[in-house]
Design a protein with these regions (language model features):
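Short, acidic, metal-binding catalytic loop of nucleotide-sugar glycosyltransferases
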Residues: 23-33
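Short internal beta-strands
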Residues: 35-41
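Acidic-and-aromatic substrate-binding clefts and catalytic sites of carbohydrate-active enzymes
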Residues: 14-17, 41-45
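Active-site-proximal specificity loops/subdomain of glycosyltransferases
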Residues: 44-93
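GT-A fold catalytic core of metal-dependent nucleotide-sugar glycosyltransferases
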Residues: 86-134, 138-146
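N-proximal low-complexity "stem/linker" segments adjacent to membrane-targeting elements
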Residues: 1-17
Length: 154
């Protein structure tokens, strides 16, 4: 059984309004026992923070090296976490560590929850899948519509 804990990660100072909307929707729709907002350097102010600061069960947790202990990886994830620069790559490693050690449901800060996860929590595990999207670099090409046609049209 999966713990009724939602985990969000934010690496950076300004927590956005959209992140606040994501966490607020998860809280109101799913009603988890706890919500972890694991962060690095996040300021507890601004529009996003104002939306979540009063949520019952919200735990604002700074990233710690101890999150990476006990992964049976000889410290590789922790070393990579401190070596990598891209926030998305660092968040991937942190997500792996948190779910492995503590369990729960990880959600990105751009996910709007519209239905509770109660049935999914009864499973040993689950994963969400997003539809295939066009790469961002495509729209920087000389004629993006040509690529759009090739990728999307039958």
């Amino acid at each position: 059984m999966i713990p009724n804990r939602l985990i969000f990660i934010w690496l950076g100072p300004k927590f956005p309004w959209s992140g606040g909307v994501a966490i607020r929707s998860a809280y109101q729709v799913h009603k988890p026992q706890s919500i972890w907002l694991v962060h690095e350097g996040m300021e507890q102010q601004g529009e996003g923070w104002e939306l979540i600061k009063d949520i019952e069960g919200l735990e604002v947790i700074p990233v710690k090296d101890s999150h990476f202990e006990g992964l049976n990886d000889d410290g590789l994830c922790l070393k990579l976490f401190h070596t990598l620069k891209a926030p998305a790559s660092r968040a991937n490693l942190l997500r792996l560590a948190l779910l492995y050690k503590y369990g729960g449901v990880y959600l990105d800060t751009d996910v709007i929850v519209v239905k509770p996860f109660d049935d999914l929590l009864q499973l040993e595990g689950f994963i969400g899948v997003e539809p295939v999207a066009l790469p961002a670099g495509l729209f920087k090409s000389v004629n993006p519509f040509r690529w759009f046609y090739l990728c999307v049209m039958p």
